[in-house]
């Protein structure tokens, strides 16, 4: 009996290796959606011009976390606690972090509309931020703690919520509609861990750096 269970898991792992490699998940960011209109507003993001003007005007007074960043991610899929596959994307996207009230909002650097709402909030501990993310497609919310290192690197991680797993493993893809996949997700036996690494763009002349990155 034990042999059959192990064999079944191995078969599932082989299937999900193929599945995860075909899994072109668009990275969702995350924020705390206090109001419905807040969500609607941030669908549209900020324009390049608005961000350029902000960084140019405030270049000498920016908070440590503010600026332009490149984001990388390491994704690891687990099934029944067994690591199936790990894949990395070192330069997933370029993002801008801008202070708005008590929040540090996250925007796509190129000004394109966003499919997520995300922000950092400073804590009482230096270099530690609360990160919140609202997935607009699935209406899932995640939160975690982010570490700012040397004012130039951000690091945090979390597991993809069940709504995301359902969308990309059960409702779509080669195993669309699979009852076995649905059961594994609902039982919490499928876990997709995301580790995020942000690296800040740094230059002696920060204004020129911002403008160059925005125009590229």
Report the location of each language-model feature.
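Intrinsically disordered, low-complexity interaction hubs enriched in FG repeats
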Residues: 147, 154-157, 166-183
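Amphipathic/hydrophobic helical signal segments and adjacent flexible N-terminal regions
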Residues: 7-21, 29-86, 171-216
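Extended, compositionally biased low-complexity polar/Lys-Gly-rich tracts
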Residues: 89-104, 152-154, 163-166, 183-208
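Central antiparallel beta-sheet cores of small beta-barrel/beta-sandwich binding domains
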Residues: 55-56, 63, 70-157, 165
């Amino acid at each position: 009996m034990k042999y059959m269970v192990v064999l079944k898991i191995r078969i599932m792992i082989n299937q999900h290796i193929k599945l995860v490699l075909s899994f072109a998940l668009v990275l969702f960011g995350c924020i705390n959606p206090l109001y419905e209109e807040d969500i609607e507003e941030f669908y549209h993001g900020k324009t390049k011009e608005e961000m350029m003007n902000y960084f140019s005007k405030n270049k000498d007074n920016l908070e440590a976390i503010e600026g332009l960043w490149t984001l990388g991610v390491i994704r690891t899929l687990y099934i029944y606690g067994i690591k199936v596959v790990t894949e990395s994307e070192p330069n997933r996207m370029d993002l801008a972090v801008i202070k708005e009230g008590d929040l540090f909002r996250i925007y796509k650097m190129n000004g394109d509309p966003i499919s997520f709402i995300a922000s950092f909030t400073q804590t009482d501990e230096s270099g530690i931020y609360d990160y919140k993310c609202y997935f607009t497609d699935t209406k899932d919310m995640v939160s975690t703690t982010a570490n700012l290192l040397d004012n130039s690197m951000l690091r945090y991680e979390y597991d993809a919520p069940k709504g995301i797993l359902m969308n990309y493993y059960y409702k779509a893809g080669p195993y669309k509609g699979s009852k076995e996949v649905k059961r594994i997700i609902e039982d919490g036996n499928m876990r997709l861990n995301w580790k995020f690494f942000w690296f800040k763009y740094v230059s002696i002349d920060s204004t020129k750096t911002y403008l160059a990155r925005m125009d590229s």
